[in-house]
């Protein structure tokens, strides 16, 4: 029965050498092998069980062990390995799963008598062994070499694609990295340096590359870091700059891959060997598809004896319930240990000499070995008892060992020394009263070796913490509580944030028990010096999360597969016809083998009417467990008692009931037919309404917009947009290349020009440096060449060429030109970037507009149903196809009408001749474009673009370029042919549709004509019909069936015709699409050519405009300079002449003062005619400058202020008096603030004239100076020049001592010597009228030698002053402007007429306008009136008068003060 079991125990018949029994313990003793081994024939190895050497006579040998041929070995490992063999033991001992068995004496202090000297033969190997090694230790070691250590698989690089390099480069880098590092995971610095130096980059660049690549700062490079270094080297080699910091995307990719490599554990599992009796621990785990890798221990542990012992599972050495007891011949000499009795652990009922090997247990002198007596194991024996050399070990402290997959929770090799500081951490984090007051983190930190996975003890501590804080048993801990717990660890806030992120992957804001354990474990690792990982390693993923993710993935896969199946079978359109079951199954792995497979559910239920049966008495409820009761006896008796008459009566009643049922059925059939006809009529009416609505939609003006949602067109437009978007970078790069070439050409052209302009300059040196730069060697060669040329010229007698230019000047010129070229290039580059950005934004907007928004599965289903006629009846399908054909026909017609109207508009547009209204037709046509086809829109866009180009070229004065590829007539002919073709197709479709409609109407009429006959022939009379009616109904049914067959045949024929028509339409549609695509390509080519020509023309226009502007600016500059020079010369000459005339006039006046004795009253009356006549006579020789005044006259005539036409010249002349811009600004400000009427209009009128050309003050001043020579030689404006400086009262008070007196005179009228002098001066000029008039102008000119510019105002008032000045004062109501005008016009306006003949007639009317405005009298009469009484005092002040006349300002001040005293002047005039 057990004959074959020995093959698994390594015996003689063992067919698997090298595979010992699982977990068998070899003997261990301090004695030689010869003394331990007792010859025996059993199949077990002797096994010590007990203490050291004792007296052999004290204990009775106890037989233990099993017979070789009848007993199976006992398994103490994983319980699921050999369950059948364990069940075959006859009442034997059953080892409980995972239950360690102790075969020695419990640990206690050992008396000295038991001490045994340690042997020297103790094996020194204490390293842990795997289960395979322990199993191999039981086999024969002769000729069987120990298994070789697993070969290193080399550096493992994760199969992760780096986005910043290509796949080919990554493969090359992987090969290079593996060849450089061998079996290591990292590349040391020296090897990396050797590889990086091959790039021949400078050391500074390689240093930057190393700093950026070594992300871990470890002095070594992982593969992703090495790939990053290669990528950066490639960047630098290609000429691009290195980034200061790595982009976040690259940094995250490199860090993630480094973490994956760091967390990875090499797979050291040996190869699968032949099947042995060793139980397979992986069998129950085969279904786990996502087993995590083995955990990586940061620091390897040196296993201890306790660990070694704990890895060995004890074996039962016999059957448990066996008789034990002391043998009668055993003396009690054990002392305190006398209670231990030898126990019989063998198989009772067998001869000890035959089957069992004696095995003493308890205290004995020589431990006897039991077990298999086979070949010696190749490994040292393992101790299983309390040996003398292990006296210091405590065998009681055995640690439970993992029996699952490494890396799972609670199954990790904990450190031998335990987890330090874990209890302190627990006490620190436990909820305590008064913890708010503060806490200390002392004693929490350390440097212990902590694995990635969570041990059982650690998990238990964390669970206790969780339960302690989860007082309400919610199953989770909130964020606030977690902050309080984790904050007591003393870690930084950033580390705690990262730990929380890792522990709460779903971002729920709370932690369950497993997630809390993960957080605490990470905190514990951080306190012991381990960094917080960037991502959670597989060992720390909670089982609940892992299982949930697997479940979710399985559900998703099931749903996706179900959706794919339904989509492929069309189940989502007709769910009841697919046979797909929608019953919810609770098993993810059941599939077709699940118990519920094949059974029908409610989603597929269909009632089987034929299976329905009538009443069965056997289906009644049975009473109790008895058999079916018999029918009631009463009914049997009643049936037996019925007579013949009663039976006949029952038959008649039954017949009546059957006839009534037939009648009801026929009535119901009629009602159903009526309802069917009504429904059919309603459906037809609905279809008619639908047709009418569709026709209204097709004929509506805005019907074109509904075609915008065409999916095919959207996709075509998206593809076209993508093609254009792909061309943008190419065009931009081409533009940049052309810009570089232009810049280089400009620089080279400048070098050539500079070399031609400066022959001996250093600019003609040809640079040999990078980029054509001139190096120092080039300069040295050029200087040497120049010296040689100079020597050659000296020897030849030629003059030595002098170097008029040095190296610095040439370099500066070249640098300036390079800077300007660079600036232009940067500006163009910025424009290019702006264009790219705008194109990108426009592309994004187009993409957003082309996206199919709101496209859900329900909407897709409905659209396919009603637009593609899927999942509907045949009648509805035909109706939908009919509507689509009608829509296409109407669309073609509308398109032709819109095109015809557009052509009419285009023909009418040029005839109208209005270029500005041209966009209106294009806007109108654009409104109808969305409804038209793609080709029409392209053609319309091309036409609009050509029209805009023609308008721009016409505006620029260029002749538009006509496209010679296709003339207008050819294009019109082609479009006409296409239009006729489309009309013909539309008419054919209309004819087909009409024929179909007529055929359908004829069929309906036939069906309606046949339909009434059926109910007439079938409807019976009201009386109960006979049974014959059933045969008639059967005949009618056959007729119906024949009619249905004919209808079906006709319908099949119609479907075939419709199908052929659809195929023909599809072929026609494909042909039209191909033609449209060809036309579109042709149009695109034409558009590109047109755009190229347009760009060239625009560039020519722009260059022409620039040249014209440059020429115009140069001409204006030359004219302005010439005018300025001419004006300056004319002003100087006029000033000299005025000074001479003024001086002569003053001399004559002084002589006249001595000779004249006229009264003061006569002076004012005679001054006005005296001033007017000589001024006119004086203007005769100076009329020559009147010609250039036409421009100012036209400007002044066009000014809005015509009423004060004479004020502008005054202001203009006053402004040209000073060339200081600050004085002009202050003077204008003072003029605007003066309250007196005369100066008010001057700045107001002057400022608009100055602003006509430019707002720049310097430009305006230049214009004023350029107009100076136009107004030279005007004598009568010298009084105006005296009146002008009154605005300078407060600014030029330091001019002379008379200015202060003038200021006083402003305050008190009639006082001051200046007024007296002026009255004396003007009074003495009365008798010699012509002479005094001429002298009056000369002294006035000489009195203003510095401010000569008032003369320039002369020509301007001549035309305006002679005609409009006298009429200007009376009309305007406001006093200030008229006051200013008559104040000048009464005395000065009559003198300056443009022509001498006009002056005498204009002189007499001048006094009449003077009296009406008393507030504004003429300035000359006013001083004598105000200073009339003190006139005699003027004689002694002649020297002061001359000084004031020479000063100029004082004399003008007098006149200004006289104007302010308008009341006295009015009295004098009266």
UniProtKB/Swiss-Prot annotation:
Ranges where the WH2 domain occurs: 1437-1454
Tagged with keyword Cell membrane: yes
InterPro entries: DUF1720 (IPR013182), EF-hand-dom_pair (IPR011992), EF_hand_dom (IPR002048), EH_dom (IPR000261), WH2_dom (IPR003124)
Sequence ranges of Acidic residues compositional bias: 1151-1163
Residue ranges with Low complexity bias: 25-48, 77-101, 348-360, 627-637, 917-932, 1181-1195
Gene Ontology terms: cellular component: actin cortical patch; endosome membrane; plasma membrane
Protein origin, superkingdom: Eukaryota
Domain EH: 169-257, 458-547
Region (Disordered): 1-157, 282-305, 343-377, 614-641, 794-864, 886-1087, 1099-1470
GO terms (BP aspect): endocytosis; endosomal transport
Record-annotated EF-hand domain positions: 201-236, 491-526
Protein location: Cell membrane; Endosome membrane; Cytoplasm, Cytoskeleton, Actin patch
Chain intervals with Polar residues compositional bias: 54-75, 129-139, 1169-1180, 1243-1269, 1340-1352, 1457-1470
Membrane topology classification: Peripheral membrane protein
Subunit structure: Component of the PAN1 actin cytoskeleton-regulatory complex.
PANTHER family assigned: DYNAMIN ASSOCIATED PROTEIN 160, ISOFORM D, EH DOMAIN
Family note: Belongs to the PAN1 family.
Protein name: Actin cytoskeleton-regulatory complex protein pan1
The species this protein was found in: Neosartorya fischeri (strain ATCC 1020 / DSM 3700 / CBS 544.65 / FGSC A1164 / JCM 1740 / NRRL 181 / WB 181)
């Amino acid at each position: 029965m057990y004959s074959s079991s020995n093959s698994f125990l390594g015996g003689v018949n063992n067919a698997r050498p090298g595979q010992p029994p699982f977990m068998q313990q070899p003997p261990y003793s301090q004695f030689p092998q010869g003394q331990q081994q007792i010859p025996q024939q059993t199949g077990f190895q002797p096994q010590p069980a007990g203490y050291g050497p004792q007296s052999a006579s004290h204990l009775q040998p106890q037989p233990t062990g099993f017979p070789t041929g009848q007993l199976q070995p006992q398994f103490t490992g994983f319980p699921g390995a050999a369950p059948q063999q364990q069940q075959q033991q006859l009442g034997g001992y059953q080892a409980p799963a995972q239950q360690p068995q102790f075969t020695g004496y419990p640990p206690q202090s050992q008396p000295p008598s038991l001490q045994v000297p340690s042997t020297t033969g103790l094996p020194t190997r204490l390293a842990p062994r795997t289960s395979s090694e322990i199993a191999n230790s039981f086999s024969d070691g002769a000729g069987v070499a120990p298994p070789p250590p697993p070969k290193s698989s080399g550096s493992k690089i994760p199969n992760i694609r780096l986005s910043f390099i290509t796949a080919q480069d990554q493969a090359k880098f992987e090969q290079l990295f593996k060849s450089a590092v061998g079996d290591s995971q990292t590349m040391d610095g020296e090897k990396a340096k050797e590889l990086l130096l091959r790039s021949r980059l400078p050391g500074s660049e390689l240093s930057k590359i190393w700093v950026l690549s070594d992300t871990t700062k470890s002095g070594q490079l992982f593969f992703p870091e090495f790939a990053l270094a290669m990528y950066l080297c490639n960047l630098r080699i290609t000429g691009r700059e290195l980034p200061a910091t790595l982009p976040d995307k690259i940094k995250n990719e490199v860090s993630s891959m480094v973490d994956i490599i760091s967390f990875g554990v090499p797979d050291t599992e040996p190869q699968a060997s032949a099947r042995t009796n060793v139980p397979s621990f992986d069998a129950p785990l085969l279904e786990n598809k996502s087993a995590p890798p083995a955990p990586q221990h940061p620091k390897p542990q040196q296993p201890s004896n306790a660990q070694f012992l704990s890895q060995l599972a004890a074996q039962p050495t016999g059957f448990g319930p066996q008789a034990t007891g002391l043998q009668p011949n055993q003396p009690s000499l054990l002392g305190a240990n006398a209670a231990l009795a030898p126990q019989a652990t063998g198989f009772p009922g067998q001869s000890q000499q035959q089957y069992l090997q004696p095995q003493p247990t308890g205290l004995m002198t020589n431990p006897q070995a039991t077990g298999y007596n086979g070949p010696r194991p190749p490994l040292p024996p393992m101790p299983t008892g309390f040996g003398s050399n292990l006296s210091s070990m405590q065998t009681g402290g055995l640690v439970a060992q993992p029996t699952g997959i490494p890396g799972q929770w609670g199954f990790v090799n904990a450190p031998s020394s335990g987890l330090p500081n874990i209890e302190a951490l627990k006490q620190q984090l436990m909820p305590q009263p008064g913890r708010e007051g503060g806490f200390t983190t002392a004693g929490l930190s350390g440097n212990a070796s902590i694995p990635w996975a969570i041990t059982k003890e650690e998990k238990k501590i964390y669970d206790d913490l969780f339960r302690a804080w989860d007082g309400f048993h919610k199953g989770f801990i909130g964020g606030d509580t977690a902050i309080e717990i984790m904050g007591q660890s003393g870690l930084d806030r950033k580390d705690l944030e990262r730990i929380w992120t890792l522990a709460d992957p779903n971002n729920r804001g709370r932690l369950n028990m497993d997630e809390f354990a993960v957080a605490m474990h990470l905190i514990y690792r951080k306190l012991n010096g381990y960094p917080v990982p960037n991502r959670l390693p597989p060992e720390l993923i909670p089982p609940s999360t892992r299982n949930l993710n697997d479940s979710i993935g399985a559900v998703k896969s099931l749903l996706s597969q179900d959706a794919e199946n339904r989509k492929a079978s069309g189940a989502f359109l007709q769910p009841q016809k697919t046979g797909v079951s929608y019953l919810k199954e609770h098993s993810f792995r059941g599939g077709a083998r699940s118990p519920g497979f094949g059974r029908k559910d409610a989603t597929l239920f269909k009632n089987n009417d034929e299976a329905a049966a009538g009443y069965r008495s056997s289906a009644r409820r049975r009473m109790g467990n008895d058999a079916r009761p018999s029918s009631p006896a009463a009914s049997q008796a009643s049936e037996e008692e019925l007579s013949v008459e009663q039976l006949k009566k029952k038959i008649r009643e039954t017949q009546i009931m059957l006839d009534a049922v037939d009648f009801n059925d026929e009535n119901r059939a009629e009602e159903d037919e009526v309802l069917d006809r009504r429904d059919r009529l309603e459906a037809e009416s609905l279809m008619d309404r639908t047709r009418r609505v569709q026709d209204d939609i097709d004929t509506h003006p805005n019907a074109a917009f509904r075609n915008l949602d065409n999916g095919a067109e959207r996709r075509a437009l998206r593809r076209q947009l993508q093609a254009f978007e792909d061309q943008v970078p190419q065009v931009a790069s081409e533009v940049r290349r052309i810009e570089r070439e232009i810049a280089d050409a400009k620089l080279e052209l400048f070098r050539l020009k500079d070399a031609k302009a400066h022959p001996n300059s250093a600019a003609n040196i040809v640079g040999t440096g990078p980029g054509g730069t001139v190096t120092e060697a080039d300069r040295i060669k050029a200087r040497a060449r120049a010296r040689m040329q100079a020597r050659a010229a000296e020897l030849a007698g030629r003059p030595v060429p002098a170097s008029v230019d040095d190296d610095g000047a040439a370099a500066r010129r070249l640098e300036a030109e390079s800077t300007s070229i660079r600036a232009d290039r940067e500006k163009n580059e910025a424009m290019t970037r702006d264009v790219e950005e705008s194109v990108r934004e426009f592309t994004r907007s187009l993409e957003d507009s082309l996206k199919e928004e709101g496209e859900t599965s329900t909407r897709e289903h409905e659209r396919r149903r009603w637009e593609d006629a899927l999942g509907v009846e045949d009648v509805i399908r035909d109706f939908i196809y009919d509507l689509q054909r009608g829509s296409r026909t109407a669309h073609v017609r509308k398109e032709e009408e819109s095109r015809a109207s557009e052509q009419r508009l285009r023909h009418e547009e040029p005839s109208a001749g209005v270029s500005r209204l041209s966009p209106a037709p294009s806007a109108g046509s654009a409104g109808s474009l969305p409804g038209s086809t793609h080709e029409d829109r392209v053609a319309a866009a091309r036409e609009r673009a050509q029209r805009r180009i023609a308008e721009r070229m016409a505006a620029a004065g260029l002749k538009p370029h006509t496209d010679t590829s296709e003339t207008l007539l050819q294009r019109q002919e082609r479009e006409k042919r296409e239009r006729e073709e489309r009309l013909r197709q539309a008419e054919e479709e209309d004819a087909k549709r009409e024929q179909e409609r007529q055929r359908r109407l004829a069929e309906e009429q036939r069906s309606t004509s046949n339909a009434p006959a059926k109910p007439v022939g079938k409807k019976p009379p009201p009386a109960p019909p006979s049974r014959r009616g059933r045969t008639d109904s059967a005949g009618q049914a056959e007729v119906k069936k024949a009619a249905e067959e004919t209808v079906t045949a006709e319908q099949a024929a119609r479907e075939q015709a419709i199908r052929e028509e659809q195929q023909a339409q599809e072929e026609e549609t494909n042909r039209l699409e191909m033609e449209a695509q060809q036309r579109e390509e042709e149009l695109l080519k034409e558009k590109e050519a047109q755009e190229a020509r347009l760009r060239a023309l625009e560039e020519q226009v722009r260059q022409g405009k620039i040249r014209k502007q440059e020429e115009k600016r140069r001409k204006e500059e030359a004219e302005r300079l010439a005018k300025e020079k001419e004006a300056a010369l004319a002003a100087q000459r006029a000033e000299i002449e005025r000074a001479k005339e003024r001086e002569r006039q003053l001399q004559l006046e002084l002589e006249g003062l001595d000779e004249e004795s006229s009264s003061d009253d006569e002076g004012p009356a005679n001054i006005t005619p005296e001033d007017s006549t000589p001024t006119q006579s004086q203007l005769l020789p100076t009329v020559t400058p009147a010609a250039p005044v036409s421009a100012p006259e036209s400007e002044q005539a066009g000014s809005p202020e015509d009423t004060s036409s004479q004020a502008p010249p005054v202001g203009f002349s006053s402004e040209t008096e000073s060339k200081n811009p600050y004085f002009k600004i202050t003077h204008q400000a003072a003029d605007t603030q003066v309250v007196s009427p005369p100066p008010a209009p001057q700045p107001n009128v002057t400022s608009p004239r100055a602003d006509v050309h430019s707002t720049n003050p310097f430009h305006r001043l230049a214009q004023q100076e350029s107009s100076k020579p136009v107004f030279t030689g005007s004598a009568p404006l010298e009084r105006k020049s005296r009146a002008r400086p009154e605005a300078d009262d407060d600014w030029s008070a330091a001019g002379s001592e008379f200015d202060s007196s003038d200021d006083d005179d402003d305050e008190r009228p009639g006082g001051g010597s200046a007024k007296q002098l002026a009255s004396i001066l003007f009074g003495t000029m009365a008798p010699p009228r012509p002479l005094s008039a001429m002298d009056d102008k000369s002294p006035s000119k000489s009195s203003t030698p510095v401010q000569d510019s008032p003369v320039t105002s002369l020509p301007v008032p001549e035309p305006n002053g002679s005609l409009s000045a006298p009429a200007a004062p009376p009309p305007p109501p406001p006093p200030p402007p008229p006051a200013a005008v008559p104040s000048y016009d009464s005395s000065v306006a009559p003198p300056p007429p443009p022509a001498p003949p006009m002056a005498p007639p204009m002189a007499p009317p001048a006094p009449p306008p003077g009296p009406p405005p008393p507030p504004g009298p003429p300035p000359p009469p006013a001083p004598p009136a105000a200073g009339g009484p003190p006139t005699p005092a003027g004689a002694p002040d002649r020297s002061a008068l001359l000084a004031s006349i020479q000063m100029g300002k004082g004399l003008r001040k007098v006149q200004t003060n006289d104007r302010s005293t308008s009341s006295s002047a009015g009295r004098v005039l009266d």
